[in-house]
């Protein structure tokens, strides 16, 4: 009986770890690179900001490729969280594990094992994670991004502002839209800090006034 209890306890530790690893591997799929290859576009790591993300794919001149990249990058943040939500409870995985798995997917996008750990900045993937954790939180964050992008035309500034407000929204929404979880808050803070860190060069360009505005295309559009 005691051995059976020990086995069950060890399995309860194994499942969250396995889910976290799976989340990281899903996050490591760099769809900006994959979609660009499939659609015959230049590698987004070779032009514009050299960032493998939807915004830089848009600079290639293909709106379709950018939209597909955006949706897939968001989906890879959303899916691991939802898998835990749908199937995790019998295995001891609840809200804290969902946040951990989402963070792992986000880190996978930033440092993808399949692409030499050279990834994007994680904005779309972070939004997908938020959508899995709380659609209301994702809506508030997305609205913040849209407002900033519309008025200032800087994707990076919109992303940075949204990142700062994510944990703020989560704290102030406690007791109204959700009940605060320290594990979720820690994951959100970690995502926000990592996203800001990945935008260090953008911050420098914003200060210097040399940051590219939304809609600016790269010179090279398609493979020759």
UniProtKB/Swiss-Prot annotation:
Enzyme Commission numbers on file: 2.3.1.275
SMART domains per the UniProt record, alphabetical: G3P_acyltransf
TM stretches of this protein: 14-34, 64-84, 98-118, 127-147, 160-180
GO biological-process terms attached to the record: phospholipid biosynthetic process
GO cellular component, one term: plasma membrane
Topology of the protein relative to the lipid bilayer: Multi-pass membrane protein
Keyword set, alphabetical order: Cell inner membrane, Cell membrane, Lipid biosynthesis, Lipid metabolism, Membrane, Phospholipid biosynthesis, Phospholipid metabolism, Transferase, Transmembrane, Transmembrane helix
UniProt subcellular location: Cell inner membrane
Keyword Lipid biosynthesis in annotation: yes
UniProt key word Acetylation: no
Reaction equation(s) it catalyzes: an acyl phosphate + sn-glycerol 3-phosphate = a 1-acyl-sn-glycero-3-phosphate + phosphate
Enzyme class: transferase
Role of this protein: Catalyzes the transfer of an acyl group from acyl-phosphate (acyl-PO(4)) to glycerol-3-phosphate (G3P) to form lysophosphatidic acid (LPA). This enzyme utilizes acyl-phosphate as fatty acyl donor, but not acyl-CoA or acyl-ACP.
Oligomer and partners: Probably interacts with PlsX.
Protein name: Glycerol-3-phosphate acyltransferase
Organism for this UniProt entry: Albidiferax ferrireducens (strain ATCC BAA-621 / DSM 15236 / T118)
Gene giving rise to this polypeptide: plsY
